[in-house]
Amino acid sequence: MAHKKGVGSSRNGRDSESKRLGVKEGDGKFVSAGSILVRQRGTKIYPGDNVGRGGDDTLFAKVDGIVKFERKGRDKKQVSIVVPEVVAQ
């Protein structure tokens, strides 16, 4: 039996495609309704006010407003959308 594998063959060279997860819109940024805020696996960040959660745990804006990341208790995070007050003139 050969103790070396045949020439020109490799058992490496496979990898899965990256999933492009993470925060998509930063804190303090103005976003429109339907904008994706966070792509994640599981609820690493929880939805707050005016934020929805998709079937794949993606967080998205339900209304136009400003993104606000905040702590939820001691060890959890959440993202909310703050609707700016309309200034009457």
From Swiss-Prot:
<dbReference type="InterPro" id="IPR018261">
    <property type="entry name" value="Ribosomal_bL27_CS"/>
</dbReference>
<keyword id="KW-0687">Ribonucleoprotein</keyword>
<dbReference type="Pfam" id="PF01016">
    <property type="entry name" value="Ribosomal_L27"/>
</dbReference>
<protein>
    <recommendedName>
        <fullName>Large ribosomal subunit protein bL27</fullName>
    </recommendedName>
</protein>
<feature type="compositionally biased region" description="Basic and acidic residues">
    <location>
        <begin position="12"/>
        <end position="26"/>
    </location>
</feature>
<dbReference type="GO" id="GO:0003735">
    <property type="term" value="F:structural constituent of ribosome"/>
</dbReference>
<keyword id="KW-0689">Ribosomal protein</keyword>
<comment type="similarity">
    <text>Belongs to the bacterial ribosomal protein bL27 family.</text>
</comment>
<dbReference type="GO" id="GO:0022625">
    <property type="term" value="C:cytosolic large ribosomal subunit"/>
</dbReference>
<feature type="region of interest" description="Disordered">
    <location>
        <begin position="1"/>
        <end position="26"/>
    </location>
</feature>
<dbReference type="GO" id="GO:0006412">
    <property type="term" value="P:translation"/>
</dbReference>
<dbReference type="InterPro" id="IPR001684">
    <property type="entry name" value="Ribosomal_bL27"/>
</dbReference>
